[in-house]
């Protein structure tokens, strides 16, 4: 499958499962600078399909951060909760092509097995009130990450058929992100290395749907003092909007970018774009040092 031969379109796509933290800001700044240095568009998408995990107030904090840190999205902010019918339509398309099947396996039944064995693949179960899995093949899927280099995975060996819709009716992240990246005309994805192993799944699904492949860049992760990646699950501190300029300086330093003058956030971002050096970012999955 070929790549899109169009102007750069990138995005920042946080989930409102908690407030934005320093690790989130690193991703936002890197994706913004990379888009702007290529004279591209930078879009914001709120990935809020997993309703039970949404944390009260986090969406408002995300939107406040976008404004306070001087980001200027090139279009309206998209909310996945408004697009559930679209995802269902794509699922129907996959059903019609016999590329997915219903699965009745529970977490208890699967136990600790990381690789799904295909228990339900040939049972022809009704789709109602069941999870929906997409079929994978025994083949190698590779992509050339712009920072991490060549990445390969055989989904049949490493993962097995994976879920696109949960039995509780929640659309899985993998389906929603692939559909939205295509519908929004995305060409480039800049995100954290914690999502590196999601990429082959998304490439596989995009190939099944006939979507052009994207260009990927997976950033090294900021870590806390315990050696854990900064995340909502690890209780990373929420960004303090009153310290936006200082956070921008710290984020650029973490990415090994040239220093920018302490100024208003929007002016600092403009200077960061003008000085952006992708080859300065460490070619690893973790950043040295600790970040609170």
Curated annotation (Swiss-Prot):
Pfam families hit by this protein: tRNA-synt_1c
Record keyword Nucleotide-binding present: yes
Motif mapping: 'HIGH' region: 14-24
Binding site for Zn(2+): 103, 105, 116, 120
A single GO molecular function term of this UniProt record: ATP binding
Motif 'KMSKS' region location, chain numbering: 229-233
Keyword set includes Glycosyltransferase: no
E.C. number(s) listed in UniProt: 6.1.1.-
Keywords: Aminoacyl-tRNA synthetase, ATP-binding, Ligase, Metal-binding, Nucleotide-binding, Zinc
Family recorded in the similarity comment: Belongs to the class-I aminoacyl-tRNA synthetase family. GluQ subfamily.
PANTHER family, per the entry: GLUTAMATE--TRNA LIGASE (PTHR43311), GLUTAMYL-Q TRNA(ASP) SYNTHETASE (PTHR43311:SF1)
Protein name per the record: Glutamyl-Q tRNA(Asp) synthetase
